[in-house]
Design a protein with these regions (language model features):
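Conserved G1/Walker A P-loop phosphate-binding module
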Residues: 1-72, 76-88, 92, 170-174, ...
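C-terminal-of-GTPase-core extension/linker across diverse P-loop GTPases
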Residues: 4, 9-17, 23, 97-195
């Protein structure tokens, strides 16, 4: 028997993309945060209050690497937890690498999601450019936004350190989660009508 976490939205990305920092910023969860890969070794849940009497559960999924769907970096274990979410929040670090390398990182995570499950590949996804407060990110943010938008993604640029953009992102996630909940209710009603 296997226990899978139940969350409304899941944070995905490479190690050190800023997933734990974002979860700590927007919820009461206190994941370990450090500047080395695989600080997060197990999924962590946080409850995000995004409007009066409205909240959602956000899962910090440990970083995914190439080959995760085959178990590298324990990725297959982590991907099982993100299967239960209705919305993926895909974080990319604007401060560490060139725009081309960051876009390749974005593609790597999406390939791993698709290799694990076609359903995950089709899951609604919001792209988030992180660490925009760092001087090394300044030159990359606009081009990353443009290129991610060109792929059809809604894009947010945030700093978990300063909080810049986090409230707007959480509001958007909250609306996305509510939309997902409505779709599930409608699907359940349709399924009941067919029975």
């Amino acid at each position: 028997m296997e226990l899978r976490l139940l969350a409304d939205a899941g944070l995905v990305g490479l190690p050190n993309a800023g997933k734990s920092s974002l979860l700590a910023r927007v919820s009461a969860a206190r994941p370990k945060i450090a500047d080395y890969p695989f600080t997060t070794l197990a999924p962590i849940l946080g409850v995000v209050a995004w409007a009066d009497d409205k909240n959602f559960v956000l899962a910090d999924i440990p970083g995914l690497i190439e080959g995760a769907h085959e178990g590298l970096g324990l990725g297959d274990r982590f991907l099982r937890h993100v299967e239960r979410t209705s919305l993926l929040i895909h974080l990319v670090d604007a401060s560490e690498r060139s725009v081309d390398q960051t876009m390749e990182d974005f593609d790597t995570v999406n390939r791993e999601l698709a290799a694990y499950s076609e359903d995950l590949a089709d899951r609604p996804q919001i792209a988030v450019v992180t660490k925009i407060d760092l001087p090394t990110a300044a030159d990359n943010v606009d081009e990353l936004r443009e290129r991610l938008s060109a792929l059809g993604h809604e894009v947010f640029a945030i700093s978990s350190a300063t909080g810049h953009g986090c409230r707007e992102l959480m509001t958007r996630i909250g609306h996305g989660v509510e939309e997902g909940r409505r779709r599930r209710i409608e699907l359940n009603a349709e399924t009941s009508d067919l029975a």
